[in-house]
Each structure stands twice: as C-alpha cells, then as structure tokens.
C-alpha cells in the first residue's frame, strides 16, 4: 500500500464513527478489521449480535474500545436509522449469495432502505459492495473488449441462465446509484470478483467452500471457463480507500487476475500436492476458454496494490486447515496469514 494511503487513513480515520452492514460476513469482517486498524470507531450490524457466529469480530484488535454490534435488518428501515445514528459513513456490505427467486426484490428494497436511512440520519458518504456478477455476464461482449467500470451484465441473459444473484446485484447497484443521487449522498461502489483468501469468521462462505470442494476432489470436474479473482484483504482495503478519498465516486472494479479454472486447479495442486484435487475438465466440445481483458486501473490510481492469487489460495487453505474445515494430511508450514 502506498505511503499516501497510509497517511490518509491515519489522519482521517481517527475517532470517526462508521457503520458496516453485514459485519460478520467474509468481506464484512475484513472491512471491520481494516477500519479498526485505521483508527475508526465501528458499529457493525447483524440480525443477532449475540450469535456466536459474530464472536470473531469482538476478538479483533481495537474491538474492545472501538467496535459495537447492533441488531439491524435491511428490510427494517427503523433499525437501520438507529444503526446509522451519529455515523459519518456507511459501508453497505450485507448481501446473501444465493439464487433464491426472492433475492432480487429483497436486494432492491434492502438497498433502498439503506440509502434512505443513511440520508435520513445525516450520513454524507456511502460505500456499496456490488459484484462483478453485475458486470461480466454479457454473452455479446467481444472477446477483445476490456472489462471495466462501464460494463454491465445482460439482465435477461442472467435471468434465463438462472444467475439470479447477478440479477440482484445489478438491480441493487442501480437502486443505490439512483437513490443516492436523489438524496444527495456521495456514493462509491466497489465491484469485487470471486473473493479469495483467509477467513476471519468460523464458517465457510461461498468462495472458501468453492476452494475446499476442488481441493478435496468433491467436485469431480471443473468447467471449461474462466473467472476473475481477488484477495479479500484487497477488497476490504478498496472499501476504505474509496471512502477516504472525497473525489472517489462511482464504480471501482476490484479484480486481481482472470484465469481459466484449470490454472486455478494447477496452483492448488502445486501448493498442496497431497490433496486429491479435481483434475478433470468438463468436455463441452468447445475450445479452451481464454481469459478476458480487464482494467483495475481506477483502484490502482488510488494506491491499491493487488495480492497474487497464489498467495491468496495458499493462505485460504492454511486458514481452513486451522479452523478444521480441511484435514491436515501433511505438515503445515508455519506461515502467518493475518
């Protein structure tokens, strides 16, 4: 991270109160950790703050003095207003990963509630967590086109292919942008891709479970497909970075690399050769898919440096071993991941 970013954080973060929705999730937990490191006072929302699944947040450095958890639901506007009271900024991270048909209207209503509650309580700046599912799902995009902040997924294509999570993130992001403009809120949108790296929470999330299933060979084959990846710590830093830069508005594509699933599996096998990792590619009769071009320049221009995927995968697996989600079938190297 650049020295300018460090200085920015140290000067602006001290004593400021911000709220993080979905604080106990994979990304939300790292956003909370990053904010605490930077000196912020943090209020995290959860449906049940006393639930043991949120206990890891209270163990973070600085949590005793500067972290509080409160009960809030994105579908309950009154609970959001209470959570945002006295806050300078809001990080709207909360978002389930599913293909539930009800996800789209719930995501839209929840996002509208968050933006309006923030405006009602005098919050000036909101950072919204979108997804590259709102950006890259477009079958008509040229193979030579560069994926950047101007790109949007094709809603009808996502709907027809049952990618309802992508539909939900598209509509939620559009809602956030429209509502923020109406209410005069400053809005920055972080658009992360498949997020890798170590967990702070105890339970597996979508992407860590994805890695575990491939490493254990539970998935018998992998698709002839490419995907975009980014480290969860880079995603958290991106959130804080765009929050702290007054000029940062609009979308910020948060992608570290794009590669074929075969390359991901090759990395896993090289790092952890004793696991029975998935080795067979699904035969779809098509040539091997090629990685697409992308631009993460907007975040690089703000000082963000991206973590190599190999490091993210290594530390994700070590973390899952330490938390008991993967068997220890060979001596684990002593490496810190936090």
Swiss-Prot record:
Question: Which domain of life, per UniProt?
Answer: Eukaryota
GO biological processes:
defense response; lignin biosynthetic process
Activity regulation description: Activated by the small GTPase RAC1.
| Active site, per annotation | 169
Pathway this chain belongs to? Aromatic compound metabolism; phenylpropanoid biosynthesis
For molecular function, the Gene Ontology terms on record are:
cinnamoyl-CoA reductase activity; oxidoreductase activity, acting on the CH-OH group of donors, NAD or NADP as acceptor
Record key words, sorted: Cytoplasm, Disulfide bond, Lignin biosynthesis, NADP, Oxidoreductase, Plant defense
What reactions does this protein catalyze? (E)-cinnamaldehyde + NADP(+) + CoA = (E)-cinnamoyl-CoA + NADPH + H(+)
Which Pfam family is one of those matched by this entry? Epimerase
The residues listed in the UniProt record as binding NADP(+), with positions renumbered to this chain, are 22-28, 47, 53, 73-74, 93-95, 165, 169, 192-195, 207
What does the function comment of this entry state? Answer: Involved in the latter stages of lignin biosynthesis. Catalyzes one of the last steps of monolignol biosynthesis, the conversion of cinnamoyl-CoAs into their corresponding cinnamaldehydes. Probably involved in the formation of lignin in defense responses.
Q: Which family does it belong to?
A: Belongs to the NAD(P)-dependent epimerase/dehydratase family. Dihydroflavonol-4-reductase subfamily.
**Name of the protein in question:** Cinnamoyl-CoA reductase 1
Gene designation per UniProt: CCR1
